[in-house]
């Protein structure tokens, strides 16, 4: 039997990128922004006057290297690899300076994944997997397999896709019905 494949986004799915951006912007501009303030919006729409600072933070060398891993992501992804071909599909073209940081981060926190399964791209319609777990509705819209939205503060009002709220939900979605 052929194994199904799952492509997984990195930012806001495997890694808490937004939390780190908010911390850095708050520190540099003394803002005090809380995650809850986004309420269905992107950070750049909540503080448009600081869009340049957000870009500066994202382009800072090392930014993507030190992100926190989302709770349970490592253990669930490892379990998924026992039954599925798992790929990491990250839109690194949005921040071209992020390539090496993202690669090193993936090697450190997901050492059980084959680096040949890391896909650094722009638009994820090039990824030919059975499933895509992503927080970005634009990427899910163009994906040709089954799109699964990973909940993030900016997408909470989007109901166009099947949704998982956490890595425990991902585990339940993909592994609960696997025959043992």
UniProtKB/Swiss-Prot annotation:
<dbReference type="GO" id="GO:0008253">
    <property type="term" value="F:5'-nucleotidase activity"/>
</dbReference>
<comment type="function">
    <text>Dephosphorylates the 5' and 2'(3')-phosphates of deoxyribonucleotides.</text>
</comment>
<feature type="active site" description="Nucleophile">
    <location>
        <position position="9"/>
    </location>
</feature>
<dbReference type="GO" id="GO:0046872">
    <property type="term" value="F:metal ion binding"/>
</dbReference>
<feature type="binding site">
    <location>
        <position position="9"/>
    </location>
    <ligand>
        <name>Mg(2+)</name>
    </ligand>
</feature>
<feature type="binding site">
    <location>
        <position position="11"/>
    </location>
    <ligand>
        <name>Mg(2+)</name>
    </ligand>
</feature>
<dbReference type="GO" id="GO:0009223">
    <property type="term" value="P:pyrimidine deoxyribonucleotide catabolic process"/>
</dbReference>
<dbReference type="InterPro" id="IPR023214">
    <property type="entry name" value="HAD_sf"/>
</dbReference>
<dbReference type="Pfam" id="PF06941">
    <property type="entry name" value="NT5C"/>
</dbReference>
<comment type="similarity">
    <text>Belongs to the 5'(3')-deoxyribonucleotidase family.</text>
</comment>
<keyword id="KW-0460">Magnesium</keyword>
<keyword id="KW-0479">Metal-binding</keyword>
<dbReference type="InterPro" id="IPR010708">
    <property type="entry name" value="5'(3')-deoxyribonucleotidase"/>
</dbReference>
<keyword id="KW-0378">Hydrolase</keyword>
<feature type="active site" description="Proton donor">
    <location>
        <position position="11"/>
    </location>
</feature>
<feature type="binding site">
    <location>
        <position position="135"/>
    </location>
    <ligand>
        <name>Mg(2+)</name>
    </ligand>
</feature>
<protein>
    <recommendedName>
        <fullName>Putative 5'(3')-deoxyribonucleotidase</fullName>
        <ecNumber>3.1.3.-</ecNumber>
    </recommendedName>
</protein>
<dbReference type="InterPro" id="IPR036412">
    <property type="entry name" value="HAD-like_sf"/>
</dbReference>
């Amino acid at each position: 039997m052929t194994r199904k494949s799952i492509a997984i986004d990195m930012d806001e799915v495997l890694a808490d990128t937004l939390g780190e951006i908010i911390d850095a912007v708050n520190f540099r501009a003394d803002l005090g922004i809380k995650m809850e303030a986004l309420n269905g919006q992107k950070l750049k729409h909540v503080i448009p006057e600081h869009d340049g600072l957000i870009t500066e933070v994202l382009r800072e060398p090392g930014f993507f290297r030190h992100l926190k891993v989302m709770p349970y992501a490592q253990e669930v992804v490892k379990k998924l690899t026992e039954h599925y071909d798992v790929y990491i599909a990250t839109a690194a073209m949005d921040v071209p300076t992020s390539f090496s940081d993202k690669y090193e981060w993936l090697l450190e926190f997901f050492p059980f994944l084959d680096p040949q399964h890391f896909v650094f791209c722009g638009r994820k319609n090039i990824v030919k997997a059975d499933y895509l777990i992503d927080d970005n509705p634009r990427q899910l819209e163009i994906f040709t397999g089954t799109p699964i939205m990973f909940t993030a503060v900016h997408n909470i009002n989007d109901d166009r896709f099947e949704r998982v709220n956490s890595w425990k939900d991902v585990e339940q979605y993909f592994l609960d019905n696997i025959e043992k």
